[in-house]
């Protein structure tokens, strides 16, 4: 098993025997670059018996999600502007969602540069319980040396469940918090969500829509989420097209909103206003979009299905934004909103792992040192 250490800010911690990046072939001699294996004796009674799935914190409103969706509505509605107006004011084509978010969140606040270091290897199969136990002990030792009260160790889904079982039954590892790697890394979670979207929307005609842009043989890979980049691009194009259809008549018919949107978009792209300053106009557009979606959903089941599709992909965007901007509350809220779709698509092992992960993350505020929690979530 290999691993990496991520520290923020850079040079905040030093890892003894860290493996430096080199060119060419690496030759390991003896115990250099390796962690001594600590055998793990599995107890007769599984530690999972002491883990109870409790209800997650329920909120009546999600301010972090609503603010993000308002900015998304401004981006989506910008494509409803008349072509002549776009060419006159912006010259080139409008940016994609990623480009728009990069400009909109350019002043999101101060940040620190992180450092990634390669850790020594554990010469065991990663699925071996002794290997996971050794990794947790190594992380715990490094945590104590850095005088940190809490240490986060990330694993992929199968290893996360094993690490959770081990850490729960070992009092000496109480400061170590196993983290579901696929819940904490945005591309992996997005793969699962896009897979859920593909399964839920199977047979709806979405495949035929994608086939107009992508090769027919690549569409199944897009629907399953295995072709991640294509899936994100395809869903983004579909959302953009549907959003324009929903909003175009409403915005063009209202000259006041059209003028406000055009002016706001120009200022936002020019860096003249911040996200907070776009709030009044963004709220209007978001409400207009929501009202129109409710109106269309009431017409028939087909319209309701496609509106639900838009809502599903909005969650993908929210989660991506949370990871890129380091928005802790948006991260938790978007993950909670994804849970029903994991169950609907019968991804039960992943739904179980995400629920346990969220349960642990919600408990951090009470269990962690206040200073460490503030630095971790800011």
Which sequence ranges carry the predicted segments?
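Buried hydrophobic core signal strongest for RNase H-like alpha/beta domains in large
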Residues: 1-378
């Amino acid at each position: 098993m290999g691993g990496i250490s991520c520290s923020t800010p850079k040079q905040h911690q030093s890892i003894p025997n860290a493996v430096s990046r080199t060119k060419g072939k690496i030759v390991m001699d003896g115990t250099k670059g390796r962690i001594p294996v600590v055998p793990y004796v599995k107890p007769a009674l599984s530690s999972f018996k002491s883990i109870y799935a409790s209800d997650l914190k329920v909120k009546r409103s999600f301010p972090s999600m609503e603010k993000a969706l308002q900015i998304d509505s401004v981006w989506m509605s910008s494509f409803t502007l008349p072509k002549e107006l776009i060419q006159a004011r912006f010259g080139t084509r409008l940016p994609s969602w990623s480009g728009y978010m990069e400009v909109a969140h350019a002043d999101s606040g101060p940040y620190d540069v992180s450092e990634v270091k390669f850790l020594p290897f554990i010469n065991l199969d990663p699925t071996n319980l002794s290997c996971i136990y050794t990794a947790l002990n190594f992380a715990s030792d490094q945590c104590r040396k850095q005088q940190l009260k809490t240490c986060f160790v990330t694993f992929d889904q199968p290893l996360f469940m094993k690490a959770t079982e081990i850490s729960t039954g070992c009092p000496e590892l109480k400061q170590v918090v196993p983290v579901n790697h696929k819940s904490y890394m945005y591309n992996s979670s997005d793969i699962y969500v896009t897979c859920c979207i593909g399964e839920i929307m199977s047979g709806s005609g979405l495949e035929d829509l994608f086939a107009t842009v992508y090769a027919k043989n690549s569409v199944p890979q897009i629907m399953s989420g295995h072709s991640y980049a294509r899936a994100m691009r395809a869903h983004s194009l579909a959302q953009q097209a549907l959003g324009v259809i929903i909003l175009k008549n409403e915005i063009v018919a209202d000259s006041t909103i059209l003028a406000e949107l055009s002016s706001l978009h120009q200022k936002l792209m020019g860096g003249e206003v911040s996200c907070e300053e776009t709030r009044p106009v963004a709220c209007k557009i978001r409400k207009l979009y929501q009202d129109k979606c409710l109106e269309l959903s009431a017409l028939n089941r087909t319209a309701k299905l496609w509106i639900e599709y838009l809502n599903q992909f909005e969650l993908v965007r929210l989660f991506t934004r949370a990871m890129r901007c380091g928005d802790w509350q948006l991260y938790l809220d978007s993950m909670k909103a994804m849970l029903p779709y994991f169950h609907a698509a019968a991804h039960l092992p992943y739904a179980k792992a995400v629920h346990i992960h969220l349960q642990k993350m919600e408990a951090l505020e009470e269990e962690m040192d206040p200073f460490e929690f503030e630095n971790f979530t800011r």
